[in-house]
Amino acid sequence: ADGSKDPIYLDRFNKKLKKDKTEIVYAERYGVGAGSLDDTLVTHIGNRIFTIIGKIFFDLKLNDILHTFFLCEVKKFKQINFEFKDFSFCVEFPIKAKRNNLSCSYIPTIEKKRYDGVPKVRSFVDGVKILTGMIILFFKR
């Protein structure tokens, strides 16, 4: 963990999960009351592109497909058969959650500046892996 996910949101996740009676609550860095102190221009643009692809091809309602900060019921999470062990998991989880008819809601969050060194993501290389993962998932309906 790089410290960019603020644990202050855990209580909000839990309250939202119970209030909305959903199975997943996603944190979002884009929209009213949200933001990121860790995004670069390249990662921001890439995330916007992948989010749009997710909305168009997978009918996702997320505004932040690559922000893998969420709360999900453990039994529901374990029902999903995950394939990817790289950054493609960021898109695999919401796509497969939707395909498994898991209900979801969202909370705005502020992503903190990481305190543990440099980002592990290699924007172009990992972006290609994520796009490849989305293509595989699209054809594996």
Residue positions per predicted region:
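Catalytic donor-sugar/metal-binding loop of nucleotide-sugar-dependent glycosyltransferases
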Residues: L60-K61, F82-K85, P94-K112
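Acceptor/aglycone-binding surface of glycosyltransferases and processive sugar-polymer synthases
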Residues: P7-F87, K113-I135
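Functionally engaged cysteine thiol sites
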Residues: H67, C90, N101
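The conserved acidic donor/metal-binding loop of glycosyltransferases
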Residues: A1-S4
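Short active-site alpha-helical segment characteristic of glycosyltransferases
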Residues: Y9, F89-K96
